[in-house]
Amino acid sequence: MISVGAFAACARQGERVVVGDGARGPAVSVARLGMKERLFAFLSHVPLLKHCDAVRRYAEQVRTENRRTLEVFVLALSKRYGPEGAKAAFDYGARRDGAPLDQRRVRNMVSIAEHFHGTGDAKPMARQIVFRSWECQGLDHPGHASLTIKNQADADAGRHVYEHVSWWPDRKLGGKENVNRVEPKMQDGYRIDKRSEISTTTEQRLREGDAARRKILADGFKYANEDERHDARFFPRAGQKLDKDAQWGLSARKVYFPAIGFNHDKRDTDGPRAFVLFGLNEAAMLRDARTVKEGAKTGELKFQMISKKENCASMALRVLRAGGAEHFVPFTAAWISEDPNRAHAYALAVQARIDALNQQRADVERHCARLRGSASVRQAWRAFSEAGNASGSPLADQAGRGRASAHTRQARLDEHAREVERIGASFAELSAGRSGKHRDRADADLADAMKRCAPSARDDVAALTRKASVLVETLGRHLDAPPPSDSSALRMLAAHAMIGRIEAFMADAIAA
Protein backbone atom coordinates (compact mmCIF):
# COMPACT_ATOMS: atom_id res chain seq x y z
CA MET A 1 0.00 0.00 0.00
CA ILE A 2 1.45 3.36 -1.05
CA SER A 3 1.52 5.86 1.82
CA VAL A 4 0.32 9.46 1.82
CA GLY A 5 3.91 10.49 2.51
CA ALA A 6 5.09 8.89 -0.74
CA PHE A 7 2.56 10.94 -2.72
CA ALA A 8 3.57 14.12 -0.88
CA ALA A 9 7.28 13.47 -1.51
CA CYS A 10 6.76 13.01 -5.27
CA ALA A 11 4.43 16.00 -5.49
CA ARG A 12 7.09 18.31 -4.00
CA GLN A 13 8.83 18.31 -7.37
CA GLY A 14 5.86 20.23 -8.76
CA GLU A 15 4.98 17.86 -11.60
CA ARG A 16 2.06 15.49 -12.18
CA VAL A 17 2.14 12.38 -9.96
CA VAL A 18 1.29 8.96 -11.44
CA VAL A 19 0.99 5.40 -10.13
CA GLY A 20 2.70 2.71 -12.18
CA ASP A 21 3.59 -0.96 -11.82
CA GLY A 22 6.87 -1.48 -9.99
CA ALA A 23 8.84 -4.64 -9.27
CA ARG A 24 7.06 -5.01 -5.90
CA GLY A 25 3.63 -3.79 -6.97
CA PRO A 26 2.15 -0.32 -7.58
CA ALA A 27 4.65 2.51 -7.15
CA VAL A 28 4.21 6.28 -7.18
CA SER A 29 6.44 8.47 -9.31
CA VAL A 30 6.61 11.76 -11.18
CA ALA A 31 5.11 11.61 -14.68
CA ARG A 32 7.60 11.58 -17.54
CA LEU A 33 7.73 14.97 -19.24
CA GLY A 34 9.97 14.74 -22.31
CA MET A 35 9.71 16.58 -25.61
CA LYS A 36 6.95 14.26 -26.87
CA GLU A 37 4.82 14.74 -23.75
CA ARG A 38 5.33 18.50 -23.76
CA LEU A 39 4.33 18.68 -27.43
CA PHE A 40 1.15 16.63 -26.99
CA ALA A 41 0.25 18.57 -23.82
CA PHE A 42 0.52 21.80 -25.82
CA LEU A 43 -1.43 20.45 -28.82
CA SER A 44 -4.25 19.20 -26.56
CA HIS A 45 -5.09 22.87 -25.87
CA VAL A 46 -5.03 24.00 -29.51
CA PRO A 47 -8.65 24.04 -30.82
CA LEU A 48 -7.79 22.96 -34.37
CA LEU A 49 -5.48 20.13 -33.34
CA LYS A 50 -6.82 18.71 -30.07
CA HIS A 51 -9.26 16.42 -31.95
CA CYS A 52 -6.52 14.69 -33.94
CA ASP A 53 -6.39 10.96 -33.19
CA ALA A 54 -2.85 11.00 -31.77
CA VAL A 55 -3.53 14.02 -29.54
CA ARG A 56 -6.88 12.63 -28.41
CA ARG A 57 -5.31 9.26 -27.54
CA TYR A 58 -2.60 11.01 -25.52
CA ALA A 59 -5.17 13.13 -23.63
CA GLU A 60 -7.29 10.06 -22.83
CA GLN A 61 -4.21 8.17 -21.62
CA VAL A 62 -3.34 11.06 -19.28
CA ARG A 63 -6.91 11.19 -17.93
CA THR A 64 -6.84 7.42 -17.32
CA GLU A 65 -3.51 7.72 -15.46
CA ASN A 66 -4.88 10.61 -13.41
CA ARG A 67 -8.03 8.68 -12.45
CA ARG A 68 -6.03 5.64 -11.36
CA THR A 69 -3.59 7.80 -9.39
CA LEU A 70 -6.46 9.59 -7.67
CA GLU A 71 -8.09 6.28 -6.71
CA VAL A 72 -4.88 5.00 -5.12
CA PHE A 73 -4.31 8.34 -3.36
CA VAL A 74 -7.84 8.31 -1.90
CA LEU A 75 -7.21 4.75 -0.63
CA ALA A 76 -4.01 5.98 1.05
CA LEU A 77 -5.94 8.87 2.62
CA SER A 78 -8.60 6.43 3.83
CA LYS A 79 -6.01 4.24 5.54
CA ARG A 80 -4.42 7.20 7.32
CA TYR A 81 -7.40 9.47 8.04
CA GLY A 82 -10.36 7.10 7.83
CA PRO A 83 -13.13 6.76 5.22
CA GLU A 84 -14.84 10.00 6.26
CA GLY A 85 -11.69 12.08 5.86
CA ALA A 86 -10.89 10.47 2.50
CA LYS A 87 -14.44 11.07 1.24
CA ALA A 88 -14.25 14.72 2.28
CA ALA A 89 -10.93 15.11 0.47
CA PHE A 90 -12.40 13.55 -2.67
CA ASP A 91 -15.61 15.62 -2.57
CA TYR A 92 -13.94 18.96 -1.92
CA GLY A 93 -10.44 18.47 -3.32
CA ALA A 94 -10.66 16.29 -6.43
CA ARG A 95 -12.97 18.66 -8.34
CA ARG A 96 -12.61 17.84 -12.08
CA ASP A 97 -12.70 14.27 -13.36
CA GLY A 98 -9.29 13.26 -14.70
CA ALA A 99 -7.52 16.32 -13.27
CA PRO A 100 -3.79 15.82 -12.52
CA LEU A 101 -2.64 15.05 -8.99
CA ASP A 102 -0.02 17.74 -8.44
CA GLN A 103 1.56 19.42 -5.41
CA ARG A 104 -1.31 21.87 -4.87
CA ARG A 105 -4.00 19.18 -5.08
CA VAL A 106 -2.11 16.74 -2.84
CA ARG A 107 -1.59 19.44 -0.21
CA ASN A 108 -5.23 20.55 -0.43
CA MET A 109 -6.67 17.03 -0.17
CA VAL A 110 -4.41 16.10 2.76
CA SER A 111 -5.46 19.30 4.55
CA ILE A 112 -9.16 18.50 4.04
CA ALA A 113 -8.72 14.91 5.23
CA GLU A 114 -6.85 16.10 8.34
CA HIS A 115 -9.65 18.52 9.23
CA PHE A 116 -12.36 15.85 8.98
CA HIS A 117 -10.25 13.26 10.78
CA GLY A 118 -9.37 15.71 13.51
CA THR A 119 -6.21 17.68 14.20
CA GLY A 120 -3.92 17.12 17.15
CA ASP A 121 -1.64 14.48 18.66
CA ALA A 122 -4.03 14.08 21.61
CA LYS A 123 -6.71 12.24 19.60
CA PRO A 124 -5.81 8.75 20.96
CA MET A 125 -5.29 9.96 24.55
CA ALA A 126 -7.54 8.91 27.42
CA ARG A 127 -7.63 12.47 28.80
CA GLN A 128 -8.38 15.01 26.08
CA ILE A 129 -10.32 18.13 25.20
CA VAL A 130 -12.11 18.24 21.83
CA PHE A 131 -12.94 21.60 20.22
CA ARG A 132 -15.51 21.18 17.44
CA SER A 133 -16.73 23.69 14.89
CA TRP A 134 -19.02 23.86 11.89
CA GLU A 135 -18.16 26.51 9.32
CA CYS A 136 -19.89 29.89 9.55
CA GLN A 137 -21.20 31.15 6.19
CA GLY A 138 -23.07 34.24 7.37
CA LEU A 139 -26.18 34.79 9.50
CA ASP A 140 -28.26 32.43 7.35
CA HIS A 141 -25.73 29.65 7.99
CA PRO A 142 -23.99 30.67 11.24
CA GLY A 143 -22.39 27.29 11.94
CA HIS A 144 -21.62 26.26 15.50
CA ALA A 145 -18.81 25.65 17.99
CA SER A 146 -18.75 23.34 20.99
CA LEU A 147 -16.24 21.80 23.38
CA THR A 148 -16.03 18.45 25.16
CA ILE A 149 -13.86 17.52 28.14
CA LYS A 150 -13.16 13.77 28.23
CA ASN A 151 -11.40 11.67 30.85
CA GLN A 152 -11.39 7.91 30.28
CA ALA A 153 -8.22 7.23 32.25
CA ASP A 154 -9.93 5.25 35.03
CA ALA A 155 -10.51 1.54 34.46
CA ASP A 156 -13.97 2.00 36.00
CA ALA A 157 -16.19 3.40 33.23
CA GLY A 158 -18.53 4.80 35.88
CA ARG A 159 -15.84 7.34 36.81
CA HIS A 160 -15.23 8.59 33.28
CA VAL A 161 -15.77 12.30 32.62
CA TYR A 162 -17.76 13.63 29.65
CA GLU A 163 -18.55 17.33 30.00
CA HIS A 164 -20.04 18.87 26.86
CA VAL A 165 -20.46 22.64 26.41
CA SER A 166 -22.73 23.49 23.49
CA TRP A 167 -24.52 26.86 23.67
CA TRP A 168 -27.74 27.25 21.66
CA PRO A 169 -30.78 29.56 21.67
CA ASP A 170 -34.02 28.00 22.95
CA ARG A 171 -35.70 28.78 19.61
CA LYS A 172 -34.83 29.47 15.98
CA LEU A 173 -33.64 33.06 15.48
CA GLY A 174 -33.88 35.34 12.50
CA GLY A 175 -33.76 39.01 11.52
CA LYS A 176 -33.66 41.40 14.47
CA GLU A 177 -33.67 38.52 16.94
CA ASN A 178 -29.99 37.95 16.14
CA VAL A 179 -29.10 40.92 18.34
CA ASN A 180 -31.55 40.06 21.14
CA ARG A 181 -30.60 38.19 24.30
CA VAL A 182 -32.74 35.06 24.55
CA GLU A 183 -32.86 32.06 26.85
CA PRO A 184 -30.04 29.58 26.23
CA LYS A 185 -30.29 25.84 25.68
CA MET A 186 -27.51 23.33 26.37
CA GLN A 187 -27.10 20.29 24.13
CA ASP A 188 -26.21 17.01 25.84
CA GLY A 189 -23.58 15.75 23.41
CA TYR A 190 -21.86 15.82 20.06
CA ARG A 191 -24.45 13.56 18.42
CA ILE A 192 -27.22 16.11 19.09
CA ASP A 193 -25.01 18.90 17.72
CA LYS A 194 -24.49 16.95 14.50
CA ARG A 195 -28.22 16.48 14.03
CA SER A 196 -28.84 20.17 14.67
CA GLU A 197 -26.37 21.18 11.94
CA ILE A 198 -28.22 19.47 9.09
CA SER A 199 -31.38 21.05 7.65
CA THR A 200 -34.74 19.30 7.52
CA THR A 201 -34.76 19.58 3.72
CA THR A 202 -31.31 18.01 3.38
CA GLU A 203 -32.22 15.22 5.79
CA GLN A 204 -35.37 14.47 3.77
CA ARG A 205 -33.42 14.39 0.49
CA LEU A 206 -30.82 12.06 2.02
CA ARG A 207 -33.51 9.67 3.22
CA GLU A 208 -35.22 9.70 -0.19
CA GLY A 209 -31.90 9.08 -1.95
CA ASP A 210 -31.02 6.19 0.33
CA ALA A 211 -34.49 4.63 -0.08
CA ALA A 212 -34.38 5.01 -3.89
CA ARG A 213 -30.96 3.34 -4.15
CA ARG A 214 -32.11 0.45 -1.96
CA LYS A 215 -35.20 -0.05 -4.11
CA ILE A 216 -33.23 0.09 -7.37
CA LEU A 217 -30.70 -2.38 -5.97
CA ALA A 218 -33.50 -4.78 -5.00
CA ASP A 219 -35.76 -4.45 -8.08
CA GLY A 220 -33.29 -3.55 -10.82
CA PHE A 221 -32.56 -0.27 -12.57
CA LYS A 222 -34.89 -0.92 -15.52
CA TYR A 223 -37.90 -1.09 -13.19
CA ALA A 224 -37.17 2.27 -11.51
CA ASN A 225 -39.33 5.24 -12.43
CA GLU A 226 -38.00 8.71 -13.25
CA ASP A 227 -38.48 10.04 -9.68
CA GLU A 228 -36.59 7.12 -8.17
CA ARG A 229 -33.72 7.54 -10.61
CA HIS A 230 -33.61 11.26 -9.79
CA ASP A 231 -33.67 10.67 -6.01
CA ALA A 232 -30.99 7.98 -6.26
CA ARG A 233 -28.48 10.59 -7.46
CA PHE A 234 -28.68 12.43 -4.11
CA PHE A 235 -25.72 11.00 -2.16
CA PRO A 236 -24.48 12.22 1.24
CA ARG A 237 -21.62 14.68 1.01
CA ALA A 238 -18.52 14.66 3.17
CA GLY A 239 -19.44 14.82 6.84
CA GLN A 240 -23.10 13.83 6.31
CA LYS A 241 -23.72 10.42 7.83
CA LEU A 242 -26.16 8.32 9.82
CA ASP A 243 -25.60 7.80 13.53
CA LYS A 244 -26.40 4.57 15.38
CA ASP A 245 -30.00 5.75 15.86
CA ALA A 246 -30.40 6.12 12.06
CA GLN A 247 -30.49 9.93 12.32
CA TRP A 248 -28.61 12.07 9.79
CA GLY A 249 -26.05 14.54 11.05
CA LEU A 250 -23.16 16.71 9.88
CA SER A 251 -19.72 16.02 11.36
CA ALA A 252 -17.63 18.87 12.73
CA ARG A 253 -14.04 19.95 12.27
CA LYS A 254 -12.27 18.63 15.36
CA VAL A 255 -9.20 19.87 17.23
CA TYR A 256 -7.74 17.70 20.02
CA PHE A 257 -5.81 18.97 23.06
CA PRO A 258 -4.14 16.91 25.80
CA ALA A 259 -4.93 17.50 29.45
CA ILE A 260 -1.97 18.29 31.71
CA GLY A 261 -0.93 15.37 33.89
CA PHE A 262 -0.63 11.62 33.59
CA ASN A 263 -2.13 10.26 30.41
CA HIS A 264 -2.04 7.17 28.20
CA ASP A 265 -3.23 5.87 24.85
CA LYS A 266 -6.84 4.76 25.33
CA ARG A 267 -6.34 2.06 22.69
CA ASP A 268 -3.74 0.41 24.95
CA THR A 269 -5.15 0.21 28.47
CA ASP A 270 -2.10 -1.74 29.69
CA GLY A 271 0.37 0.73 28.20
CA PRO A 272 2.60 3.03 30.26
CA ARG A 273 1.31 6.28 31.73
CA ALA A 274 3.33 9.35 30.83
CA PHE A 275 3.19 12.86 32.25
CA VAL A 276 1.97 15.44 29.72
CA LEU A 277 3.68 18.69 30.65
CA PHE A 278 2.09 20.94 28.04
CA GLY A 279 -1.68 20.88 27.78
CA LEU A 280 -4.89 22.29 29.21
CA ASN A 281 -5.98 22.28 32.84
CA GLU A 282 -8.85 19.78 32.96
CA ALA A 283 -9.99 20.68 36.49
CA ALA A 284 -10.15 24.42 35.72
CA MET A 285 -12.12 23.74 32.53
CA LEU A 286 -14.60 21.51 34.36
CA ARG A 287 -15.18 24.22 36.95
CA ASP A 288 -15.82 26.84 34.28
CA ALA A 289 -18.05 24.53 32.21
CA ARG A 290 -20.22 23.86 35.24
CA THR A 291 -20.30 27.58 36.05
CA VAL A 292 -21.57 28.25 32.52
CA LYS A 293 -24.30 25.63 32.87
CA GLU A 294 -25.32 26.98 36.25
CA GLY A 295 -25.49 30.48 34.77
CA ALA A 296 -27.86 29.18 32.10
CA LYS A 297 -30.13 27.69 34.77
CA THR A 298 -30.23 30.80 36.95
CA GLY A 299 -30.74 33.17 34.02
CA GLU A 300 -27.47 35.00 34.65
CA LEU A 301 -26.27 34.04 31.15
CA LYS A 302 -28.27 34.38 27.93
CA PHE A 303 -27.77 33.52 24.27
CA GLN A 304 -27.05 36.32 21.81
CA MET A 305 -26.15 35.48 18.21
CA ILE A 306 -24.13 38.63 17.52
CA SER A 307 -22.00 38.78 20.65
CA LYS A 308 -18.45 38.61 21.94
CA LYS A 309 -19.50 36.78 25.12
CA GLU A 310 -22.80 34.94 24.75
CA ASN A 311 -22.89 33.02 21.47
CA CYS A 312 -21.75 29.44 20.86
CA ALA A 313 -18.22 30.35 19.72
CA SER A 314 -17.55 32.73 22.61
CA MET A 315 -18.75 30.18 25.18
CA ALA A 316 -16.58 27.42 23.73
CA LEU A 317 -13.63 29.84 23.66
CA ARG A 318 -14.34 30.90 27.25
CA VAL A 319 -13.98 27.32 28.53
CA LEU A 320 -10.92 26.73 26.32
CA ARG A 321 -9.24 29.82 27.74
CA ALA A 322 -10.17 28.75 31.28
CA GLY A 323 -7.97 25.72 30.69
CA GLY A 324 -4.93 27.88 29.93
CA ALA A 325 -5.04 28.26 26.15
CA GLU A 326 -3.57 31.75 26.51
CA HIS A 327 -0.45 30.28 28.13
CA PHE A 328 0.41 29.14 24.60
CA VAL A 329 -1.19 31.66 22.20
CA PRO A 330 -2.47 35.15 23.14
CA PHE A 331 -6.18 35.63 22.49
CA THR A 332 -7.53 38.69 20.69
CA ALA A 333 -11.28 39.23 20.98
CA ALA A 334 -13.35 40.00 17.90
CA TRP A 335 -14.41 43.60 17.31
CA ILE A 336 -18.11 42.82 16.95
CA SER A 337 -18.86 39.12 17.40
CA GLU A 338 -17.07 35.82 17.81
CA ASP A 339 -17.82 33.18 15.18
CA PRO A 340 -16.96 29.48 14.68
CA ASN A 341 -14.37 30.24 11.99
CA ARG A 342 -12.31 32.56 14.23
CA ALA A 343 -12.73 30.13 17.12
CA HIS A 344 -11.50 27.23 14.99
CA ALA A 345 -8.46 29.22 13.82
CA TYR A 346 -7.54 30.08 17.42
CA ALA A 347 -8.01 26.46 18.54
CA LEU A 348 -5.71 25.28 15.74
CA ALA A 349 -3.02 27.78 16.75
CA VAL A 350 -3.15 26.63 20.39
CA GLN A 351 -3.10 22.95 19.40
CA ALA A 352 -0.11 23.47 17.09
CA ARG A 353 1.84 25.23 19.85
CA ILE A 354 1.02 22.58 22.47
CA ASP A 355 1.92 19.68 20.18
CA ALA A 356 5.16 21.37 19.11
CA LEU A 357 6.24 21.84 22.74
CA ASN A 358 5.36 18.26 23.67
CA GLN A 359 7.32 17.04 20.64
CA GLN A 360 10.32 19.12 21.69
CA ARG A 361 9.97 17.71 25.20
CA ALA A 362 10.10 14.17 23.76
CA ASP A 363 13.11 15.08 21.59
CA VAL A 364 14.96 16.38 24.66
CA GLU A 365 14.08 13.17 26.54
CA ARG A 366 15.52 11.00 23.76
CA HIS A 367 18.64 13.17 23.46
CA CYS A 368 19.34 12.92 27.18
CA ALA A 369 18.87 9.14 27.04
CA ARG A 370 21.58 9.04 24.36
CA LEU A 371 23.87 11.20 26.51
CA ARG A 372 23.62 8.61 29.28
CA GLY A 373 24.98 6.07 26.79
CA SER A 374 28.49 7.35 27.56
CA ALA A 375 29.94 5.31 30.44
CA SER A 376 31.64 8.29 32.11
CA VAL A 377 28.54 10.50 31.84
CA ARG A 378 26.29 7.68 33.05
CA GLN A 379 28.49 7.02 36.07
CA ALA A 380 28.69 10.68 37.06
CA TRP A 381 24.96 11.21 36.59
CA ARG A 382 24.07 8.05 38.51
CA ALA A 383 26.09 9.25 41.48
CA PHE A 384 24.24 12.57 41.45
CA SER A 385 20.82 10.96 40.97
CA GLU A 386 21.24 8.39 43.71
CA ALA A 387 22.18 11.13 46.14
CA GLY A 388 18.84 12.89 45.70
CA ASN A 389 16.82 11.06 43.03
CA ALA A 390 16.92 14.23 40.91
CA SER A 391 16.57 12.69 37.48
CA GLY A 392 12.94 11.63 37.83
CA SER A 393 9.68 12.84 39.37
CA PRO A 394 8.68 10.01 41.72
CA LEU A 395 6.29 12.13 43.75
CA ALA A 396 4.50 13.65 40.78
CA ASP A 397 2.57 10.40 40.31
CA GLN A 398 1.40 10.50 43.92
CA ALA A 399 0.19 14.07 43.47
CA GLY A 400 -1.77 13.14 40.37
CA ARG A 401 -3.67 10.30 42.05
CA GLY A 402 -5.81 12.46 44.29
CA ARG A 403 -5.88 15.10 46.96
CA ALA A 404 -3.38 14.55 49.72
CA SER A 405 -3.51 15.98 53.22
CA ALA A 406 -2.15 19.49 53.66
CA HIS A 407 0.78 18.14 55.70
CA THR A 408 1.70 15.52 53.08
CA ARG A 409 1.41 18.03 50.26
CA GLN A 410 3.64 20.55 52.05
CA ALA A 411 6.25 17.87 52.73
CA ARG A 412 6.21 16.97 49.07
CA LEU A 413 6.59 20.60 48.00
CA ASP A 414 9.49 21.04 50.43
CA GLU A 415 11.23 18.01 48.93
CA HIS A 416 10.70 19.37 45.42
CA ALA A 417 12.21 22.70 46.50
CA ARG A 418 15.29 20.98 47.96
CA GLU A 419 15.82 19.08 44.71
CA VAL A 420 15.49 22.29 42.68
CA GLU A 421 18.17 23.90 44.86
CA ARG A 422 20.43 20.86 44.55
CA ILE A 423 20.08 20.68 40.76
CA GLY A 424 20.74 24.41 40.47
CA ALA A 425 23.87 24.15 42.61
CA SER A 426 25.16 21.23 40.54
CA PHE A 427 24.53 23.12 37.30
CA ALA A 428 26.35 26.19 38.67
CA GLU A 429 29.31 24.05 39.71
CA LEU A 430 29.51 22.44 36.26
CA SER A 431 29.34 25.89 34.67
CA ALA A 432 31.98 27.46 36.92
CA GLY A 433 34.87 26.31 34.76
CA ARG A 434 33.24 27.53 31.53
CA SER A 435 34.04 31.20 31.31
CA GLY A 436 35.55 33.61 28.83
CA LYS A 437 36.35 32.13 25.44
CA HIS A 438 35.06 28.67 26.49
CA ARG A 439 31.55 30.00 27.12
CA ASP A 440 29.51 30.52 23.95
CA ARG A 441 26.04 31.98 23.41
CA ALA A 442 24.36 28.59 23.84
CA ASP A 443 26.01 28.16 27.26
CA ALA A 444 24.87 31.61 28.30
CA ASP A 445 21.29 30.96 27.13
CA LEU A 446 21.09 27.69 29.05
CA ALA A 447 22.56 29.24 32.20
CA ASP A 448 20.09 32.13 31.97
CA ALA A 449 17.16 29.73 31.45
CA MET A 450 18.19 27.65 34.47
CA LYS A 451 18.39 30.77 36.60
CA ARG A 452 15.04 32.22 35.50
CA CYS A 453 13.06 28.98 35.26
CA ALA A 454 13.73 27.24 38.55
CA PRO A 455 10.23 26.28 39.80
CA SER A 456 8.90 26.98 43.28
CA ALA A 457 5.84 26.19 45.39
CA ARG A 458 4.52 29.70 44.67
CA ASP A 459 4.21 29.03 40.94
CA ASP A 460 0.77 28.43 39.46
CA VAL A 461 0.03 26.47 36.28
CA ALA A 462 0.65 29.52 34.07
CA ALA A 463 4.07 30.23 35.60
CA LEU A 464 5.12 26.58 35.47
CA THR A 465 4.04 26.33 31.81
CA ARG A 466 6.05 29.43 30.93
CA LYS A 467 9.16 28.16 32.72
CA ALA A 468 8.88 24.71 31.15
CA SER A 469 8.47 26.26 27.68
CA VAL A 470 11.63 28.33 28.05
CA LEU A 471 13.70 25.40 29.33
CA VAL A 472 12.46 22.96 26.68
CA GLU A 473 13.01 25.40 23.81
CA THR A 474 16.46 26.37 25.11
CA LEU A 475 17.50 22.73 25.42
CA GLY A 476 15.99 22.07 22.00
CA ARG A 477 18.56 24.39 20.44
CA HIS A 478 21.34 22.13 21.79
CA LEU A 479 20.19 18.92 20.12
CA ASP A 480 21.82 19.33 16.72
CA ALA A 481 25.42 18.76 17.82
CA PRO A 482 26.89 16.36 20.41
CA PRO A 483 28.19 18.02 23.58
CA PRO A 484 31.93 18.78 23.39
CA SER A 485 32.66 17.35 26.84
CA ASP A 486 31.24 15.30 29.70
CA SER A 487 30.73 18.53 31.60
CA SER A 488 28.48 19.88 28.84
CA ALA A 489 26.52 16.62 28.77
CA LEU A 490 26.02 16.75 32.54
CA ARG A 491 24.82 20.35 32.28
CA MET A 492 22.16 19.25 29.80
CA LEU A 493 21.14 16.38 32.07
CA ALA A 494 20.84 18.83 34.97
CA ALA A 495 18.59 21.09 32.88
CA HIS A 496 16.54 18.04 31.93
CA ALA A 497 16.23 17.13 35.61
CA MET A 498 14.95 20.66 36.28
CA ILE A 499 12.15 19.99 33.79
CA GLY A 500 11.36 16.90 35.86
CA ARG A 501 11.01 19.14 38.92
CA ILE A 502 8.64 21.41 37.00
CA GLU A 503 6.54 18.32 36.24
CA ALA A 504 6.45 17.49 39.94
CA PHE A 505 5.30 21.00 40.88
CA MET A 506 2.80 20.94 38.00
CA ALA A 507 1.26 17.70 39.25
CA ASP A 508 0.66 19.35 42.62
CA ALA A 509 -0.64 22.56 41.05
CA ILE A 510 -3.35 20.82 38.99
CA ALA A 511 -4.32 18.53 41.89
CA ALA A 512 -4.68 21.35 44.43
Curated annotation (Swiss-Prot):
Keywords of this entry: Coiled coil, Secreted, Virulence
Region (Disordered): 388-415
Coiled-coil segments on the chain, per record: 347-374
Pfam families: SicP-binding
GO cellular component, one term: extracellular space
Predominant location: secreted
Entry's localization field: Secreted
InterPro entries: Globular_prot_asu/bsu, SptP_N, SptP_N_sf
Function description: Plays a role in mediating bacterial evasion from the host autophagic pathway.
UniProt similarity note: Belongs to the BopA/IcsB family.
Protein name from the UniProt record: Effector protein BopA
Organism (species): Burkholderia thailandensis (strain ATCC 700388 / DSM 13276 / CCUG 48851 / CIP 106301 / E264)
Gene that encodes it: bopA
